[in-house]
Amino acid sequence: MVALYCGGGLRPLMLSWSRDLPCIWRALHTSAVCFKNRAARVRVGKGNKPVTYEEAHAPHYIAHRKGWLSLHTGNLDGEDHAAERTVEDVFLRKFMLGTFPGCLADQLILKRRANQVEICALVLRQLPAHKFYFLVGYSETLLSHFYKCPVRLHLQTVPSKVVYKYI
């Protein structure tokens, strides 16, 4: 709800959305503010929350203790299309999460080398091998046609999620 106040007098007026009156417009928003501040790290708990190596280290340790999850030359000085690469990365991550539901053990690593996109992932052994082969072929073919460049999936299977430590 917005209550508008005309600056000429002492009484507030409820006005319509027309701006025909020659006065100063002020708006009072009465809806609650929703602050969404979130840290980019895993919250410390009672020591019973399993985390991976990537999750255990804070973001300021990138390039010191952990690596980048997306490797490309878009962020170098003088290079274009950094925003497009970020949108493509988000799409690729969501596509892989949807294609392999509940099977990804860790974050994806996306590499762009020349005209080729490589996707590296740790996958849980929840599906039979022939279903994994089908999903790999399906993903590579669909993404290659979509991006008009070769897309390769490098998957490594693990029996369970790799736990680095408990926080």
From Swiss-Prot:
Residues 1-35 form a transit peptide. Disulfide bonds: none annotated. The keyword Mitochondrion applies. Coiled coil: none annotated. GO terms for biological process: mitochondrial translation. Component of the mitochondrial ribosome small subunit (28S) which comprises a 12S rRNA and about 30 distinct proteins. This is Small ribosomal subunit protein uS3m. The lineage of its organism: Eukaryota, Metazoa, Chordata, Craniata, Vertebrata.
